[in-house]
């Protein structure tokens, strides 16, 4: 069942008659850039005997002191049953993704997951590049530290210029424009200047909450940001 923020415990109570329960959440919500309250989610999972699955697409490589994701941010490593992620964002912009978890869960997915069974294998070059990216992030915090500094610099500059920008715990910065047409015009003019951003408006976001979404990169020099 789907749940809104603050309704999870009620949903878990209703699901007590079920044999299995699993809570599925994003690590970082892609429209606002805010992190899921994973500490509270894991506490409820333990209370109501539920598994926890987190999509780390926007949080792996970004959140936490060393970029190891939302479980590092909340000091919950080993307490999430299934983690999914992508190689298409923080880990180099390639194709493909990954799922991690206990061996019995992964073994079952290899046999029963239709998307996995009917997908082609990743090209060896992509796998090799992904492995090297993980090694780079494990050996040095330089890129992660640069990302954090760039996000702080971007937010400070935008707010100083008078823009309304949502709080964020990630590299996603939502610049609020509130008008759907304005968000599209704003995005188009920025692309004319060589800056790629995306304008979002209803129904992707609530009515009156149109915005452009900026994803800050560690690859940008501070002067460019």
Regions inferred by a protein language model and the residue ranges of each:
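Active-site C-terminal subdomain of aminotransferase-like
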Residues: 48-51, 58, 63-169, 182
């Amino acid at each position: 069942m789907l749940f809104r923020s603050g309704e999870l415990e009620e949903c878990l109570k209703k699901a007590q008659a079920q044999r299995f329960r699993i809570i599925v959440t994003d690590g970082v919500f892609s429209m606002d850039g805010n992190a899921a309250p994973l500490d509270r989610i894991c506490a409820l999972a333990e209370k109501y005997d539920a598994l926890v699955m987190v999509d780390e697409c926007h949080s792996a490589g970004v959140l936490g002191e060393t970029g190891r994701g939302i479980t590092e941010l909340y000091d919950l490593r080993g307490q999430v049953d299934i983690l999914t992620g992508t190689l298409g964002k923080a880990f180099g912009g390639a194709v493909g993704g990954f799922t991690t978890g206990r061996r019995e869960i992964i073994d079952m997915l290899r046999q029963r997951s239709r998307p996995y069974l009917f997908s082609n294998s990743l090209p060896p070059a992509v796998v090799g590049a992904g492995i090297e990216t993980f090694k780079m992030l494990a050996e040095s915090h330089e890129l992660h530290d640069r990302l954090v500094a760039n996000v702080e610099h971007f937010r400070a500059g935008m707010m100083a210029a008078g823009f309304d920008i949502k709080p964020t715990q990630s590299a996603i910065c939502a610049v609020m424009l509130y008008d759907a047409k304005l968000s599209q015009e704003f995005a188009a003019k920025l692309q004319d200047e060589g800056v790629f951003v995306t304008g979002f408006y209803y129904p992707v976001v609530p009515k009156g909450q149109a915005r452009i979404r900026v994803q800050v990169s560690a690859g940008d020099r501070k002067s460019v940001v």
